[in-house]
Amino acid sequence: MGRRQLINAFVAVGSLALTVGACSNDETPTVQTLPVVLEQLLTTPSAGGERTKGDDHFEVWICRVPLDSTAAMYGGLPLRLPLTPQAVTDVVNAHVPAYFDALSHGRYRPVFTPGGEVTISAADEPQACVDGAIAGAGAKADAVLVVADAEHGEDQPGGFGSGGDGCPTAGACSVAATRRVAYVGASDFHPDWGNEPPMDLVEHEIGHSLGWVHSGIDEAGRYLSGLDLMSNSAAPRDVDPTRRDAPGTLAINLFLAGWLPADDVVVATGDATLKLSASSGDEGARLLVIDRGDGSLITVELLKAEGFDDHLPADGIAVHELRIAHGALSSVTPLVGDAPYLDLLQPGDELRVEDWTVTVSSGWTVSAAHASVT
């Protein structure tokens, strides 16, 4: 397994280096500020900012794609669905607001209202759909959800999303100013799905509109991880075909959105031990961050096999490597096991990542130990 070596062992740990705030362990924490790179992320497009607070108003637009479209995204496929802004709004409202309301513990809720329609030319790419929707959106719209009436080619992505630009220092933070968007093709609205089409792709693209980046992808852009909304969002449906929502999202996204407060983040710059609470919960120490001092971070969190993550075979500890480039989060890589990374660390397991070792003991007590590399 190379630099990611998983063995069954137990190691003793020493001193604590913890962040400010309440912790779930019995030790007295030493005050330790957030890593500089993590603080910087809070001021970059990777963080939610105003996008992740309260109601987020999306206008729903339909993009009419001509049958003779030459755009590679549509793959020359002939199907065109009779979608309307109102019908799509009704379908999306049945699942998506409740998903994000639960994920954020009531801190954030997307609100969907019908917008309009835009028709592109045969030579246009999907971006023309987005440009037309933004140009036609009302002044009160924070973002647009654009759904094409055409399916995407089998070798094409299902959609895309963008957090756009920051809000202007003066004036309204409308979609005209930020250009925030979530765009999907027609596949998830196909009549074969019946009255309950899957919403995980829409939720994934809305995640992008909040500034979140992909996790667990390979060089070809394939989503390998079943742990995160921002990777294989269909992972729960792979286990239970009746599932329509995505899995939950990783603690780093909850933190960047402001849904997991800094008081519940523990930072280790040296050896540390703590009892983790589930990252999907709303209290307790829910994220251990190992500051490697080189601009990269290791995150450790407890995922419970319940709620949006009930597709997991068991509760367990997930570990990810975060890389930051040019002040923004650039990659999130799972470090436990093999794709789809659903078999998480259990009590008695140890994970070694270069000069750091993460050990799990009973009650989801986690120890991080640092050793000098010679």
Language model regions located:
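Propeptide-to-catalytic entry region of secreted or membrane-anchored zinc metalloproteases
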Residues: 29-201, 210-218, 223, 326-374
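Residue-level marker of positions within ordered structural domains that often coincide
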Residues: 1, 28, 151, 235, ...
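Secretory targeting and sorting signals
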Residues: 1-27
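Pan-zinc metallopeptidase signature
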Residues: 261-373
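Pocket-edge structural micro-motifs
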Residues: 64, 148, 232, 302, ...
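Extracellular hydrolytic enzyme modules, especially secreted metalloproteases
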Residues: 153-309
